[in-house]
Amino acid sequence: MGLLERLRKEWFIVGIILVIAAAKLEPTIGGKGGPLKPEITITYIAVSAIFFNSGLSLKTEELTNALMHVKLHLFVQLFTLVFFPTAIWVFLQVLSLTPINEWLLKGLQTVSCMPPPVSSAVILTKAVGGNEAAAIFNSAFGSFLGIVVTPLLLLLFLGSSSSVPFTSIFSQLFMTVVVPLIIGQIVRRYIKDWLERKKPPFGAISSCVLLMIIYTTFCDTFSNPNIDLDTFSLVIIVFIIFFIQLAFMLLTFLFSTSKNTGFTPADTVAIVFCSTHKSLTLGIPMLKIVFAGYEHLSLISVPLLIYHPAQILLGSVLVPTIKSWMLSRQKALKLTRQPKVPL
């Protein structure tokens, strides 16, 4: 694959780097009170646009196909929204004794509170040949669940900014997240055939709006002379993120393949990806609302910005290995179930 083709394929990750660089060069453009007026365009319009887009693109009619696999869904959601944040909280009690930047550590906690993404876990499950219907259900259901659970987890583990009261956070979440999502689902009912025929680039649209949110977030950071990020902390956080992903992928793999769980090899693939992936699309707008007024908001966002490309990179690298395991396991199970030929 040529360099240009690779850049075109990974345009979003390239975009993140470019918008952060642009914010560094001239932070006043996207900062508070700047020409872009992020306090209106981002806080209300951009966030609402992302969730309206999610409402349009979520195929809720497909969820019924996987609805009955209760044990699998229960495991994924409990692992993602209960075990993951709790385990990271315990881990951070140890890391807080190190010289790593405390706001990056808080950022790791925010990563753990995020719901599964709508796309990446499904794409990787499909690439391996795993239980795609289960992956679709858990990604979509986790996104809906995350609208309520994620802000509660963030407030539980980190608290909100002192300038924004609890009721204000949830009223804003309702107006900019829940309402646009519901409107998107209602509109989808009426134009479903057109959407299926034309297949609008929902992912690309959300990603472009997300780049705008990331840009203004970092404009605020670089406008603040009090914020200092050391290279040591950043490098260590990258290593920690890859370690967490690998450790949790291994943990979910070992559990789902143990005896008496009843999961098929295809189920295991969906479990491994859906349980360990975290949503950037839902995460950044939520952080923007819950931590409004935090001068360190962008530092808190950094681990999530790293986690997103890391999970795609790691997942893509492991696709051939996981696929090979799944096919050999399915073959072995098929052989053991075949009736023995009498002598």
Swiss-Prot record:
This protein is called what?
A: Sodium/bile acid cotransporter 7
> What cellular component GO annotations does this protein have?
endoplasmic reticulum membrane; Golgi membrane; plasma membrane
Name the keywords, alphabetized.
Answer: Cell membrane, Endoplasmic reticulum, Golgi apparatus, Ion transport, Membrane, Sodium, Sodium transport, Symport, Transmembrane, Transmembrane helix, Transport
Instruction: Read off the InterPro entries from this record.
Output: Na+/solute_symporter_sf, Put_Na-Bile_cotransptr
Among Gene3D superfamilies, the record links this protein to: 1.20.1530.20
Which Gene Ontology MF annotations are present?
symporter activity
Q: Which residues lie on this side of the membrane: Cytoplasmic?
A: 1-10, 59-71, 138, 185-201, 256-270, 320-343
Localization recorded for this chain is: Cell membrane; Endoplasmic reticulum membrane; Golgi apparatus membrane
Where exactly are the transmembrane stretches of this chain? 11-31, 38-58, 72-92, 117-137, 139-159, 164-184, 202-222, 235-255, 271-291, 299-319
Family according to the record: Belongs to the bile acid:sodium symporter (BASS) (TC 2.A.28) family.
* Membrane topology annotation: Multi-pass membrane protein
This molecule's function is given as:
Involved in teeth and skeletal development. Has an essential role in the biosynthesis and trafficking of glycosaminoglycans and glycoproteins to produce a proper functioning extracellular matrix. Required for extracellular matrix mineralization. Also involved in the regulation of cellular calcium homeostasis. Does not show transport activity towards bile acids or steroid sulfates.
Look up the record and give one Gene Ontology term from the biological process aspect: sodium ion transport
Entry keyword Endoplasmic reticulum: yes
- The residue spans the entry assigns to the Extracellular side of the membrane are as follows 32-37, 93-116, 160-163, 223-234, 292-298
PANTHER family to which the protein is assigned, alphabetical: SODIUM_BILE ACID COTRANSPORTER 7, SOLUTE CARRIER FAMILY 10 MEMBER 7
Q: Which residues form a coiled coil?
A: none
